[in-house]
Amino acid sequence: MGYLMKTTSILLVALLVLVMMFGFVGCQPTDETAGSSSDNGPADPITFTFMTYNVRVQVSNDADKRVPYDTVKDRAPLILQHIADADPDVLCIQEWTGNHTMEVAPSLEEQYEILVFQRGDFFESCAILYKKDRFELISTEHFWLSETPEEPSKSWDAEYLRIYASTLLRDKLSNKTFRAGTTHLDLAKVARGKQRKMVVDHTANSAEPAIVCGDFNFDARHDLYLYCINTLNDCRTLVTNATTTASYNGYNVDGQILDDDGAVKNGYGYPIDQIFVKRDAFTVHSYNVLNYLIDGKFSSDHFPVVVELSIND
């Protein structure tokens, strides 16, 4: 009888030890719960930083008209500083040229994959850069903003060939995919309106969460803007603390100074460099125009625009 009681006690102690061990293991955070808040509420959203930046082509007579340092080689350190300050995960660039490939790309290519999309009739291109360690490239696409988008062409009153280019990316942190698109619309009135509709409709009809950004050559006061915000969301209007300033500066040091009525003194009161997103697809956490000089100099005749956003479930 004593032997039986002793054996039973040993078994009970062993069972208790096992329960404690497995109970402790079961309480450890898993990969799925590690990012959750401590009160078992929803996890913090996984955000990424997105920038659009017209870096300006090199024009031979700019040194006479505007500033003495306006070559891409001179401006490259300033461009790179703006990029470093924002540290974008995805960067869409307009007016990228061979000069930028030589002077800017070497400092970025270790961290970023650089995809350049040629317009076809001119030396400038659109470029999309994304961090190699953060994103996986699934596919790319581009088409011309014309009545024959499948071939290099221009229509209506357009002065230049214009394109839309995009990448479909998978975020390795969230395992979500999204489309990042960019463009640079013409200045001609009819063409600009037609091109705007093409890129806005394409973004709205995307099967994935989609962004379209770039130099639209119009701001929020223009009638062309209404169709954009009736179809997509403007990131600038989705946050309460958005920077209120122009993105185009024209190498005018007063370009970022506001009058009492909110208009910029050089006549440009709102950004023409836009970031639109597909409705209900993203949450925008911040919006900024990097409207400052570097060492007293302009990096471009445009300031970069930066947003932080997350993809909705």
Name each model-derived stretch.
Residues 26-106, 311-313:
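N-terminal, active-site-proximal structural segment of metallo-dependent hydrolase catalytic domains
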Residues 1-14:
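Positively charged n-region of N-terminal signal peptides that target proteins for export
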Residues 189-190, 201-210, 218-313:
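Metal-dependent phosphoester-hydrolase catalytic domains
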Residues 90, 94-178, 289:
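Structured beta-strand-rich core segments of catalytic domains in phosphoester-bond hydrolases
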Residues 64-68, 149-156, 182-189:
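Surface-exposed cleft-lining segments at the edges of enzyme active sites
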Residues 55-58, 96-100, 119-123, 134-135, ...:
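Solvent-exposed loop/turn segments at secondary-structure junctions
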Residues 48-55, 79-102, 129, 167, ...:
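Active-site beta-strand/loop signature of hydrolases that rely on acidic residues for catalysis
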